[in-house]
C-alpha cells in the first residue's frame, strides 16, 4: 500500500502528515496540543484535525470550547464518538446522552443529532465512509 499524506494548508503549512498507510500511529496528545495552539482555536469555538483518512473510514480529533454547539446534522455513515477530555451532550430526536471523559457511543448513519460541549472537550470522531467506486453491500 502506498502511503498517503495530507496537503499543506494555510492553517497547517507544514503538510506531509501521514493520513493513510498499512499502519498509521496516531499521537493523540501531540495532536490535541497542536489544535489547542492553532489560531483557529483562539478565534473560534472549535478546532479539528483529521488524523486518519482512507476509503471506508475517517478519524477526526475535535476540540470544542465550553458551550460550543455542533447544530443538528446527519452523517453519511456510521459514527462513533469517544470523549477523551471534558463532557458533551449528544442529542438525537429520541434522547440526550451525557458523555464524559472515557465514554463513547456509536450511531447508525442518517440519524439527526447535535453536540453541545458542557465544558472544554476533546473527542475522537470515527466515521465510516462509502468506498470509492463501490456500491453499499457489494464485495
Predicted regions and their residues:
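A short, N-terminal "cap"/entry segment at the start of jelly-roll beta-barrel domains
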Residues: 1-56, 91
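Conserved short histidine dyad/triad with adjacent acidic residue
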Residues: 44-45, 55-75
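A cytosolic small-molecule/anion-sensing beta-strand core signal
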Residues: 55, 84-85, 100-101, 119
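Structural motif
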Residues: 58, 87-89, 96, 112, ...
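Short beta-strand His + acidic residue motifs that chelate non-heme Fe in jelly-roll/DSBH
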Residues: 70-72, 90-91, 107, 112-118
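Glycine- and acidic-residue-biased ligand/ion/polar-headgroup-sensing regions
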Residues: 76-88, 93
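Short acidic-glycine-tyrosine-enriched beta hairpin
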Residues: 93-109
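Ligand-binding loop in jelly-roll beta-barrel domains
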Residues: 109-133
Amino acid at each position: 500500500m502506498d502511503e498517503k499524506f495530507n496537503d499543506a494548508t494555510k492553517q497547517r503549512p507544514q503538510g506531509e502528515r501521514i493520513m493513510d498507510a498499512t499502519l498509521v500511529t496516531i499521537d493523540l496528545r501531540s495532536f490535541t496540543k497542536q489544535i489547542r495552539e492553532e489560531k483557529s482555536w483562539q478565534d473560534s469555538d472549535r478546532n479539528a484535525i483529521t488524523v486518519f483518512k482512507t476509503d471506508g473510514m475517517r478519524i477526526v480529533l475535535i476540540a470544542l470550547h465550553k458551550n460550543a454547539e455542533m447544530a443538528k446534522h446527519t452523517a453519511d455513515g456510521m459514527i462513533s464518538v469517544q470523549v477523551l477530555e471534558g463532557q458533551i451532550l449528544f442529542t438525537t430526536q429520541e434522547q440526550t446522552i451525557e458523555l464524559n471523559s472515557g465514554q463513547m457511543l456509536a450511531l447508525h448513519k442518517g440519524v439527526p443529532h447535535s453536540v453541545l460541549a458542557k465544558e472544554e472537550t476533546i473527542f475522537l470522531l470515527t466515521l465510516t465512509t462509502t468506498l470509492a467506486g463501490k456500491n453499499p453491500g457489494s464485495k
